[in-house]
């Protein structure tokens, strides 16, 4: 089943990057270098003190034993959507145990609560059967219109819950089709009020389990006060927390913008994309919590460097130069810089020096992680070279060949390792071994990334030097039109999301931090490639979202 947000029709007038064309310059320039945050240090201190007081009050109010199960389900969901769950993980864990152990009463408070419970448990890796939806289905197997159609919130919850499907769950295929059709009808007729109308529109673009957490929090804070039974304590804490986390993000973005300006101006590769603000937006979509600051910095810096390398292989270097760049990366030694053409030497030196700085930052007991990160980066250059060879030789790979290579060139395996390098002790040596082995979950996350990217390339047009993508290889191999092949790739994309859901529930708890990075990276890609756009390459497509996330005033405190 094709995901609802994918547009598979090709554009009649595609913008083309590559060859003699250049990527558009950054839409931000040095804006975040000079931007002065409206929150003073004194104000931030006062807000932090107030937030700590409110957290204590929430802990006192969060009495899982005294709440009924339906109320507990709603409370946990509210904490998560308001972006507060990282402050109450222990309480949420205990609450989920009770939610999973206790059955809801008959009809369980309606479709909304039944579906919400299903989604929450599955998102936390707790298996729950689709049998819970039997009460809302007819004898023939379809969903009962009389029970569901007059309940927009319930339909929305069903639609979101059904996107936690694993392969082969036909009941949830039916649920998606049923709920989507009715939600579209409701929106077109204007039959639902705010804020549910906005939540439906958002989910029809990207279902909640695939939507980035930070963006959902941004939207939900504005919507929550319009809920009939909203909790003023949670709302105040959520607003404070959002502003405090944003202040940290803006400091990080300023530091990264300064770092990137120095790097980009030093290496002098004008053919490469200048996209640090977009990279950082991507980063916050993956990990926004305060405790992951170092991981964000590692991710963003590495993403920037690998983007320079990727664009060199893709749109500028000759095949001979590609071979030399790959060989230099394998040797990983500044004394080998002479094998490179002059224009690539500074890129090579700066890459190695930045990795040295990464290692210096790591605590002694975490320096073992550098071996994994270097090997991942080296492997990335090998695979970029293979793509360059295919492109130069105009080789038409089989779909299987393309899929295997693109799992690695998606960047997800390498970037997962680089992100984990900035984690605390929860990222174990076993986690690095697991990601490095490219298990099924990492493969699925990489394929989500690649298929989204390739559907975008099909719609927008490819770089002149690009090798055939997933759509083109599938089209040639199966004798299909381009749009037919794109629809098939969209269906494969949906299947890979279901594999992600399944492997998340099966994984050993010691690997959960790494698994969550993989999931979050796939989520972040959904917003970058929404409706077939490529908001990384074409940064103007992301400008409004960046403005809203980092600059728009949160509702008055």
From Swiss-Prot:
Binding of Mg(2+) 1, residues: 310, 314
Motif (DDXXD motif) on chain: 310-314
GO molecular function: magnesium ion binding; terpene synthase activity
InterPro entries recorded: Isoprenoid_synthase_dom_sf, Terpene_cyclase-like_1_C, Terpene_cyclase_plant_C1, Terpene_synth_N, Terpene_synth_N_sf, Terpene_synthase-like, Terpene_synthase_metal-bd, Terpenoid_cyclase/PrenylTrfase
Factors inducing expression: Induced by fungal pathogen infection (e.g. F.verticillioide).
Residues reported in the UniProt entry to bind Mg(2+) 2: 310, 314
GO cellular-component term (any): cytoplasm
The entry's keywords: Cytoplasm, Lyase, Magnesium, Manganese, Metal-binding, Plant defense
Pfam assignment, any one: Terpene_synth_C
Enzyme class: lyase
Expressed in which tissues: Specifically expressed in roots.
Domain remark in the UniProt entry: The Asp-Asp-Xaa-Xaa-Asp/Glu (DDXXD/E) motif is important for the catalytic activity, presumably through binding to Mg(2+).
Oligomer and partners: Monomer.
Protein's name in the database: Eudesmanediol synthase
Gene it is expressed from: EDS
């Amino acid at each position: 089943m094709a995901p609802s947000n994918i547009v598979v029709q090709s554009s009649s007038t595609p913008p083309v990057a590559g060859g003699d064309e250049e990527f558009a310059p950054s839409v931000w320039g040095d804006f975040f270098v000079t931007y002065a945050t409206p929150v003073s240090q004194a104000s931030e201190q006062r807000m932090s003190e107030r937030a700590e007081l409110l957290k204590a009050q929430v802990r006192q109010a969060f009495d899982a034993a005294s709440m009924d199960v339906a109320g507990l389900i709603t409370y946990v969901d509210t904490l998560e959507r308001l972006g507060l769950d990282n402050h109450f993980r222990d309480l949420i864990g205990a609450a989920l145990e009770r939610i999973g152990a206790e059955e809801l009463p008959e009809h369980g408070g309606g479709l909304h609560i039944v579906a919400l419970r299903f989604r929450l448990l599955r998102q936390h890796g707790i298996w729950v059967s689709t049998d819970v939806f039997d009460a809302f289905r007819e004898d023939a197997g379809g969903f009962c219109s009389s029970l569901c159609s007059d309940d927009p919130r319930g339909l929305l919850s069903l639609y979101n819950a059904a996107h936690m499907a694993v392969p082969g769950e036909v009941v949830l295929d039916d649920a998606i089709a049923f709920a989507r059709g009715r939600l579209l009808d409701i929106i077109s007729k204007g039959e639902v009020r705010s804020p549910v109308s906005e939540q439906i529109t958002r989910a029809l673009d990207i279902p909640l389990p695939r939507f980035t957490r930070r963006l959902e929090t941004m939207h939900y804070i504005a919507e929550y006060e319009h809920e009939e039974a909203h909790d003023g304590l949670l709302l105040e804490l959520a607003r404070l927390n959002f502003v405090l986390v944003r202040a940290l993000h803006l400091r990080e973005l300023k530091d990264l913008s300064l770092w990137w300006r120095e790097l980009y101006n030093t290496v002098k590769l004008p053919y490469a994309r200048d996209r640090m603000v977009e990279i950082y937006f991507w980063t916050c979509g993956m990990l926004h919590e305060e405790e992951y600051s170092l991981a964000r910095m590692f991710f963003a810096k590495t993403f920037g460097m690998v983007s320079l390398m990727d664009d060199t292989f893709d749109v500028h270097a000759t095949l001979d130069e590609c071979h030399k760049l790959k060989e230099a990366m394998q040797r990983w030694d500044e004394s080998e810089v002479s094998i490179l053409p002059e224009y690539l030497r500074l890129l090579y030196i700066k890459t190695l020096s930045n990795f040295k700085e990464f290692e210096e930052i790591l605590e002694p007991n975490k320096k073992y992680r550098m071996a994994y990160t270097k090997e991942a980066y080296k492997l990335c250059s090998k695979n970029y070279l293979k793509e360059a060879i295919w492109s130069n030789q105009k080789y038409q790979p089989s779909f299987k060949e393309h899929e295997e290579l693109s799992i690695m060139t998606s960047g997800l395996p390498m970037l997962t390792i680089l992100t984990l390098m900035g984690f605390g002790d929860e990222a174990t040596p076993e986690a690095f071994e697991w990601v490095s082995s490219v298990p099924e979950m990492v493969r699925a996350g990489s394929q989500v990334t690649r298929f989204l990217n390739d559907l975008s390339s099909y719609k927008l047009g490819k770089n002149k030097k690009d090798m055939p993508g997933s759509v083109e290889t599938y089209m040639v191999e199966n004798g299909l039109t381009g749009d037919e092949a794109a629809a098939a790739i969209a269906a494969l994309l949906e299947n890979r999301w279901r594999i992600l859901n399944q492997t998340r529930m099966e994984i050993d708890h010691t690997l959960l931090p790494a698994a969550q990075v993989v999931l979050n990276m796939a989520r972040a890609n959904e917003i970058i490639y929404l409706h077939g756009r490529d908001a990384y390459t074409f940064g103007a497509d992301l400008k409004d979202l960046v403005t809203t996330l980092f600059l728009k005033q949160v509702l008055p405190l």
